[in-house]
């Protein structure tokens, strides 16, 4: 059971884990041991609340297939257990991030000090430009 928050949990049956051989350098260990984890999570068929499903499917993430299946590949660590924990943590992190809503920006008005500084600067510039004109003797 993967716990996302106090009231959101994912049963282990909804998360499909397959173990494959990792890529890259590592010599004999990499060639013989299936330490990388391939996690598949079917978003539409999951028991997540609809709000989370909609937000996850709306993400423009290359890890989500056209069918709505999220694929995470974890091969950073040397052991299968560490890679499994990493894949599950990344899944939980993605679901939590999708559940967060951004606060709306409340527009603010310029302060009195900023208005006066702006007007003083304009007045100063005006006198500089006025001094560039023709001079009568």
UniProtKB/Swiss-Prot annotation:
Q: What is this protein called?
A: Peptidyl-tRNA hydrolase ArfB
A single MF term (Gene Ontology): ribosome binding
User: Keyword Protease: yes or no?
Assistant: no
Query: Which reaction(s) does its UniProt entry say it catalyses?
Result: an N-acyl-L-alpha-aminoacyl-tRNA + H2O = an N-acyl-L-amino acid + a tRNA + H(+)
Species source reads Pseudomonas putida
**Which EC number(s) does the record attach to this protein?**
3.1.1.29
Q: Which family does it belong to?
A: Belongs to the prokaryotic/mitochondrial release factor family.
Pfam families named among the record's database cross-references? RF-1 (PF00472)
Cellular-component GO terms for this entry = cytoplasm
What InterPro entries does UniProt report for this protein, alphabetically? Pep_chain_release_fac_I, Pep_chain_release_fac_I_sf
User: Keywords for this entry?
Assistant: Cytoplasm, Hydrolase, Translation regulation
The record describes the protein's role as: Rescues stalled ribosomes. Can hydrolyze peptidyl-tRNA on ribosomes stalled by both non-stop mRNAs and mRNAs that contain rare codon clusters.
Q: For the region Disordered, what residue ranges are annotated?
A: 102-137
Corresponding gene?
Answer: arfB
């Amino acid at each position: 059971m993967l716990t996302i928050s106090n009231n959101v949990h994912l049963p282990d049956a909804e998360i499909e884990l397959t173990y494959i051989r990792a890529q890259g350098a590592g010599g004999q260990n990499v060639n013989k041991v299936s330490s990388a984890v391939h996690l598949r999570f079917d978003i539409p068929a999951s028991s997540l609340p609809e709000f989370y499903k909609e937000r996850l499917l709306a993400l423009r993430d290359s890890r989500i297939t056209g069918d709505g299946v999220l694929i995470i590949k974890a091969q950073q660590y040397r052991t299968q257990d560490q890679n499994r924990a990493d894949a599950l943590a990344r899944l939980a992190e993605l679901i939590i991030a999708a559940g967060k809503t951004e606060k709306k920006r409340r527009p603010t008005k310029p302060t009195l000090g900023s208005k006066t500084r702006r007007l003083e600067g304009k007045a100063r510039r005006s006198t500089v430009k006025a001094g560039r004109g023709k001079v009568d003797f």
